[in-house]
């Protein structure tokens, strides 16, 4: 079974991916973790590697390659904003493709708590990051991140919370 889970920062993708991984005994592969690993492999901080990635599309291509390679083995949760799109562009069809969404202020509060940051600073950083990623995804992949047409399930996580979202996905799997 292959499940993709995407969503903007603060929607709960990592929380839900971990819960599903534990429940169904699936590997959890996260594009963000791949990015962090690549930063370490290149002896760079996350910020240095982020700056490098903005100027070098090869970074995105390598993240994509690693995601596709992991998906070939099956039995995994593939988490990342573009996970569903990457598989689609590689003619791979997941068993279930999920997009989590949440109100921007809910996401901002979640991020500020997770990162131990002031809410205003977290909001500013979140909006800058999202604008940058939206532009990059359009330029590199010709993907509109707001196009949710490829997803089997779109869930409002600020309405349901982690347990509610998990229960909805469980019903979809059955």
UniProtKB/Swiss-Prot annotation:
One of its GO terms (biological process) is pyrimidine nucleotide metabolic process. It is an enzyme of class 2 (transferase). GO terms for molecular function: ATP binding; CMP kinase activity; dCMP kinase activity. Coiled coil: none annotated. Its EC number is 2.7.4.25. SUPFAM superfamilies: P-loop containing nucleoside triphosphate hydrolases. It comes from the Archaea. Its main location: cytoplasm. Transmembrane segments: none annotated. The keyword Kinase applies. Keywords: ATP-binding, Cytoplasm, Kinase, Nucleotide-binding, Transferase. It catalyses: CMP + ATP = CDP + ADP; dCMP + ATP = dCDP + ADP. The keyword Ribonucleoprotein does not apply. Belongs to the cytidylate kinase family. Type 2 subfamily. This is Cytidylate kinase.
């Amino acid at each position: 079974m292959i499940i993709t889970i995407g969503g903007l920062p603060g929607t709960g993708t990592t929380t839900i991916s971990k819960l599903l991984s534990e429940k169904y005994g699936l590997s959890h592969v996260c594009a963000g973790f791949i990015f962090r690993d690549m930063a370490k492999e290149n002896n760079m901080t996350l910020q240095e590697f982020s700056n490098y990635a903005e100027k070098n599309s090869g970074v995105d291509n390598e993240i994509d390659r690693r995601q596709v390679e992991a998906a070939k083995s099956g039995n995994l949760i593939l988490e990342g904003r573009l996970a569903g799109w990457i598989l689609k562009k590689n003619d791979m069809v997941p068993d279930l493709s999920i997009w989590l969404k949440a109100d921007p202020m809910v996401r901002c509060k979640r991020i500020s708590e997770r990162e131990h940051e002031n809410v205003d600073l977290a909001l500013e950083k979140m909006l800058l990051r999202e604008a940058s990623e939206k532009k990059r995804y359009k330029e590199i992949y010709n993907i509109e991140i707001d196009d949710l047409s490829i997803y089997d399930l779109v869930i409002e996580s600020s309405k349901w919370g982690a347990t509610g979202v998990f229960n909805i996905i469980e019903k979809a799997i059955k």
